[in-house]
């Protein structure tokens, strides 16, 4: 039974492959001709007013000199032994030339101290994500505040020859859907991202490209066919960063150089996006041994498609019983893939 579905329309089948019709995104929105990266860049990382305004309008803000280059060198040294990839990654979710270092905060104290705990990053994330609500309980009204928490912190090494990654919204892990709007509306975001360049990042070496203004797009606005004047490759120096909303379409680009491009991407989310009870921390793993797959999944030890709750892109249940979760990676992270047909009707 499907209790909450936001399908665009009913797909149709041709030769065993499902398709859906969509139109090219023609409207430039906020990305008017002549727009340059300077329009959504700040020189002062503590100019909160400017950062917030640019994120509201464009969905992102480039922050110059976010972290000292010497700290980038320290992070690269700490993270280097932890890069990996799986052979099944042949373009999805990453090109075969890309390696990742997941759970970076556990491998690098510098990442935790100087990136994730950075005051500006936390303050901006709280601005967009914090919630304060009032709940009736008996004869009183209780006010409760939900803060932020780290959703993910992964360092990506885009190697020479890597191809373009497909555009996506980061907040798909929480099945967040958005309706088209003319201007930013608070209360719809579940993530704020921070991309930090640990090496120089430009169009040639695989910089992140972003569709400016796409945080305002709805389900019928296609990230696969749009006016390319809305596309920007984030051109930044080592130590610079880019803040962006979880609803902004973004992707890694092809690396046409002979050098690796290394950057870390860190996402804050709402702190209530988790179970009420924490059953894992402080629990001996032997408690879970011998439990059937269904029980382990009900206890939160399986991935929610596409990636939510993973440990190194595997279900946490791998630590309990690798045999029960043996097809976790090979089967892919998506329940179904539907191809898009542009500009035609069934």
From Swiss-Prot:
InterPro entries: PhyH, Phytyl_CoA_dOase-like. GO terms for molecular function: phytanoyl-CoA dioxygenase activity. One of its GO terms (biological process) is fatty acid alpha-oxidation. Keywords: Cytoplasm. Disulfide bonds: none annotated. It holds the Pfam family PhyH. It is found in: Cytoplasm. GO terms for cellular component: cytoplasm. Belongs to the PhyH family. PANTHER family: PHYTANOYL-COA ALPHA-HYDROXYLASE (PTHR21308), PHYTANOYL-COA DIOXYGENASE, PEROXISOMAL (PTHR21308:SF1). Present with 1600 molecules/cell in log phase SD medium. This is Uncharacterized protein YJR154W.
């Amino acid at each position: 039974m499907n209790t909450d579905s936001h399908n665009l329309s009913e797909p149709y089948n041709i030769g065993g492959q499902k398709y859906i019709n969509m139109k090219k995104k023609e409207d430039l929105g906020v990305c008017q001709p002549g727009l340059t990266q300077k329009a959504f860049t700040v020189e002062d990382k503590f100019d909160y007013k400017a950062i917030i305004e640019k994120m509201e309008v464009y969905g992102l803000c480039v922050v110059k000199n976010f972290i000292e280059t010497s700290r980038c060198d320290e992070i690269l040294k700490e993270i280097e032994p932890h890069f990996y990839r799986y052979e099944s990654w042949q373009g999805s979710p990453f090109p075969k030339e890309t390696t990742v270092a997941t759970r970076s905060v556990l491998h690098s104290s510098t990442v935790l101290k100087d990136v994730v705990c950075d005051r500006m990053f936390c303050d901006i994330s709280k601005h967009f994500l914090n919630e304060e609500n009032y709940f009736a309980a008996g004869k009183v009204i209780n006010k409760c505040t939900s803060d932020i928490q780290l959703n993910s912190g992964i360092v990506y090494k885009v190697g020479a020859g890597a191809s373009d990654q497909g555009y996506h919204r980061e907040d798909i892990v929480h099945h967040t859907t958005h309706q088209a709007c003319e201007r930013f509306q608070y209360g719809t975001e579940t993530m704020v991202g921070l991309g930090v360049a640990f090496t120089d990042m430009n169009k040639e070496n695989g910089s992140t490209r972003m569709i400016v203004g796409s945080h305002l797009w709805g389900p019928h606005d296609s990230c696969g066919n749009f006016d390319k004047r809305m596309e920007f490759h984030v051109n930044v120096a080592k130590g610079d960063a880019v803040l962006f909303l979880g609803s902004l379409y973004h992707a890694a680009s092809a690396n046409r150089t002979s050098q690796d491009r290394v950057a870390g991407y860190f996402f804050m989310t709402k702190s209530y996006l988790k179970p009420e009870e924490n059953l894992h921390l402080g629990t001996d793993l032997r408690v879970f041994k011998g439990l059937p797959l269904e029980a382990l999944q009900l206890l939160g030890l399986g991935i929610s498609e596409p990636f939510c709750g993973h440990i190194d892109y595997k279900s946490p249940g791998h630590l309990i019983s690798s045999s029960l979760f043996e097809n976790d990676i090979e089967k892919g992270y998506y329940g179904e893939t539907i191809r898009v047909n542009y500009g035609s009707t069934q």
